[in-house]
Amino acid sequence: MSATKPIISSAFHYATETEMLEIKQKSAKLAIGIPKETAYQENRIALIPEAVSVLVNNGHQVTIESKAGENSKYSDRDYSEAGAVITCDEEEVFKQPVIIKSASIHTADLPKLKHNQTVISPINFSLLKKEILEALAAKKITALGFELLRDDSGTFPIVRSMSEIAGSAAMLLAGQFLACSDVGKGVLLGGISGVPPTKVIIIGAGIVGESATRAALAMGASVKVFDNNVYRLKRLQNNLGYPVWTSVIEPNILAKQLKTCEAAVGALNSEKGRVPVVVTEAMVERMRPGSVIIDVCIDRGGCFETSEITSHEHPTFLKHDVIHYCVPNIASGFARTASHAISNVLMPMLLKVADNGGLDAMLWYDFNLRNGIYMYKGHLTNIYLSENFDMKYTDLNLLLATSSR
């Protein structure tokens, strides 16, 4: 049976259909303000002069309060030569639409902030207060948190960088206090030919623990790592490429190892709330006199029962003849390195935001940047903060869908 050919009318003709393509957003010009930090023990600055130079050369304006980079060993002249506007007027800095801080927003900042500004800063969950969130909401602030900014690999680059600094610094500090002839043991952290290596216990196999382990092994120390997450212990060994001694946190095994160690590093992490105390005071009492405890997780309560918060000015105290170093924000003690690491993340992000037409336009496409938003135009968009402070939560996706582009 033959197929019947369709009859095509002579009036039929083809017409070009218009393809609906999205119009590319015009690039935006950013006006950024960086105030001098007054928060306790905060020495970092969020953008180094080299990053400011790149931003200025791309047509953006950066206004920096005088001496903002002083604690990171960057002078006003460094920033001026990079193209920044230097001012002694704090009010002038806080007039800018985008404010970047290296310390979390605190109560003293609230009167200075303007309506509808964008603030990029750490959140510091352990110190955040409900009143601060309410004040930000009242001024319809859009806020991004350092801790929430994510990259294409799914990691949190600023958190990772600060953790790497803290882990490496922990071993340098432990070596310094062990060598101290006054209260330390007068030993070299590591080992030399013919002398048994010093023994280091690291509690926690996250980024801090891994960085501390790398530093200790590089110095020649004998390292033992504890963590209750077997996956993290396996990942640690894979990343190191070295079969380091590992164990889950079993109190009897941990107590036995602490009795003979020269240095113990607390590097546990907790996504919500306080880290657990895994080293009791009785365990510390049995440690060798002159040994050192570096409690990196003191900002989340500390994992040693004997830990008490100290400062960069008075970093240590002696308890049961054991030196305790319990300074929160260790990275701030290495301010220039930490500032460089933060700047390496923020500068490319700011350029990308500007090239895509500003923050609102960028949020449509960049899910990593979207993850960093915890408040959008006065609406709390972070579920954890909403539950923790009993405040109304609004899905950021809904806010973007209903906003005009």
Which role fits each region the language model picked out?
Residues P35-K36, Y40-E70, S181-G266:
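Glycine-rich phosphate/diphosphate-binding loop of Rossmann-like nucleotide-binding domains
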Residues E147-L173, F177-L188, C303-R405:
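Adenosine-phosphate binding glycine-rich loop
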Residues S126-S153, A282-C326:
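Rossmann-fold NAD(P)-binding glycine/threonine-rich loop
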Residues M1-A31, E37, T107-T198, V327:
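Glycine/serine-rich phosphate-binding loop and adjoining beta1-alpha1 elements at the start
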Residues Q41-A46, A108-K112, E271-V279, C303-E308:
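Glycine/threonine-rich flexible loop motifs
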Residues K101-S126, K259-T260, G273-I293:
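Rossmann-fold NAD(P) dinucleotide-binding segment
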Residues E17-A135, K139-I141:
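An N-terminal-biased, well-structured beta-alpha scaffold segment characteristic
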Residues G83-F94, I105, T246-E262, L268-E285, ...:
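A structured beta-alpha segment of the ubiquitous adenosine-cofactor-binding alpha/beta core
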